[in-house]
Curated annotation (Swiss-Prot):
The record marks D148 as: Important for catalytic activity for the proton relay mechanism but does not participate directly in the coordination of zinc atom. The keyword Metal-binding applies. It comes from Shewanella sp. (strain ANA-3). One of its GO terms (molecular function) is L-threonine 3-dehydrogenase activity. Zn(2+) 2 binds at C93, C96, C99, C107. This is L-threonine 3-dehydrogenase. It comes from the Bacteria. Its EC number is 1.1.1.103. Binds 2 Zn(2+) ions per subunit.
C-alpha cells in the first residue's frame, strides 16, 4: 500500500510502498479516505529535538483521518463493514487507575497513533475498535478528517463555562481559531485572539472572533478598552506555547479567572506566580480529547450549526504530499487535507 513514512533520521517524509497492517481480534481495518497534516506531523517532518527523542525510524506517521471500515476483528461489536469512522489517536492501556475510573484521556501509558505506532498516512490503518468513532451522515469527510484537532479545540474551550464571558485565546493556529469559533457558538461575549501571523488572524476573523489582534502592531490592553472591558478576561485559552503570550494572558485575566493550557512551551517557562496567587487564577492543563465525551460534543456542535469549514484552506492528492507539507510549513495555511482516493 502507499504510505508516508519517516524513513530517515533527517528532515523530510517519504512516499513508500509499505506492507498492509495486520489486524488483531479487537481491531478495525480502515481504508483511509482523507488525512490532515497536524503540527505534530510538521515537528516530525522537520526532525526537531522532540521528534529525535520520540519517533522510531522508520515508521508510517499521521493521526488525523477519516475512512471506511473494511474488516472487523472477531471480538469486535458495534461496528460493521462500510461504517465511516475517524478515531481517537491516543491508544490507552485500560488497566491504570484513570482508565479503570473512566478517565481514559488521563491514561499514564498512552501510545500515540503515528507517534509511537503506525499511523494514518497510508491507504490502510489498524486501530482498536474502542478508539473508533462513527461519523454521522450529515458531517462531511473533510470535517471528519480534522476531528482530532477540532477535539483539542473543543476540549480546551469547553473546560469552563463560557456563556456571557470574555475570552482571550493566545495563538491563532488552526486549533486556536477553531476554539474561537466554539466559544462564540456557545455564547461567549467577547472572544479576542492574539498572534503575529496576519494570514491566520484573518482566518480567525472569518471564524467569528470578536477581535483578532496582531500583538506586534496593536496593544491588547487598548483592544480591551475599545471593547469596554474594565476588569479583564474571565477565561483564557493558551494555545501557543509562547512564554510572552502566556505572560500577557496573566496580565489581562480578571480576578478569579480560569485558564486552560493546550500550547506546549519549548522548554521550562518562568512566570510571575504572584499574579496567579493574588488573582486567584485556576490553571488547567489540556492533553488531547476526553474519550469520548469530546467526540460526541464535536458532532453535536457541527450538527447544531457551527461552521468550521473555513479552517480548511488547502487540498492535495497524496502524490502531491510535498505541496501540502510546504503549505503547512509556510504559515500561510489553515488545515491541509490529503486525499487518498
Amino acid at each position: 500500500m502507499k504510505a508516508l513514512s519517516k524513513l530517515k533520521a533527517e528532515k523530510g517524509i517519504w512516499l513508500v510502498d509499505a506492507p498492509k497492517p495486520e489486524m488483531g481480534h479487537n481491531d478495525l481495518l480502515i481504508k483511509i479516505k482523507k488525512t490532515a497534516i497536524c503540527g505534530t506531523d510538521m515537528h516530525i517532518y522537520n526532525w526537531d529535538e522532540w521528534s529525535q527523542k520520540t519517533i522510531p525510524v522508520p515508521m508510517v506517521v499521521g493521526h488525523e483521518y477519516v475512512g471506511e471500515v473494511v474488516d472487523i476483528g472477531q471480538e469486535v461489536r458495534g461496528f460493521k463493514i462500510g461504517d465511516r469512522v475517524s478515531g481517537e489517536g491516543h491508544i490507552t492501556c485500560g488497566h491504570c487507575r484513570n482508565c479503570r475510573a473512566g478517565r481514559t484521556h488521563l491514561c499514564r501509558n498512552t501510545s500515540g497513533v503515528g507517534v509511537n505506532r503506525e499511523g494514518s498516512f497510508a491507504e490502510y490503518l489498524v486501530i482498536p475498535a474502542f478508539n473508533a468513532f462513527k461519523i454521522p451522515d450529515d458531517i462531511s469527510d473533510d470535517l471528519a478528517s480534522i476531528f482530532d484537532p477540532f477535539g483539542n479545540a473543543v476540549h480546551t474551550a469547553l473546560s469552563f463555562d463560557l456563556v456571557g464571558e470574555d475570552v482571550l485565546i493566545t495563538g491563532a493556529g488552526p486549533i486556536g481559531i477553531m476554539a474561537a469559533a466554539v466559544c462564540r457558538h456557545v455564547g461567549a461575549r467577547h472572544v479576542v485572539i492574539t498572534d503575529v501571523n496576519e494570514y491566520r488572524l484573518e482566518l480567525a476573523r472569518k471564524m467569528g472572533a470578536t477581535r483578532a489582534v496582531n500583538v506586534a502592531q496593536e496593544s491588547l490592553k487598548d483592544v480591551m478598552k475599545e471593547l469596554g472591558m474594565t476588569e479583564g478576561f474571565d477565561v483564557g485559552l493558551e494555545m501557543s506555547g509562547v512564554p510572552s503570550a502566556f505572560h500577557a494572558m496573566l496580565d489581562t485575566m480578571n480576578h478569579g479567572g480560569k485558564i486552560a493550557m493546550l500550547g506546549i512551551p519549548g522548554g521550562e517557562m518562568a512566570i510571575d506566580w504572584s499574579k496567579v496567587i493574588f488573582k486567584g487564577l485556576v490553571i488547567k492543563g489540556i492533553y488531547g480529547r476526553e474519550m469520548f465525551e469530546t467526540w460526541y460534543k464535536m458532532a453535536s456542535l457541527i450538527q447544531s450549526g457551527l461552521d468550521i469549514s473555513p479552517i480548511i484552506t488547502h487540498h492535495y492528492k497524496i502524490d502531491d504530499f510535498q505541496k501540502g507539507f510546504d503549505a503547512m510549513g509556510s504559515g500561510q495555511s489553515g488545515k491541509v487535507i490529503l486525499s487518498w482516493d
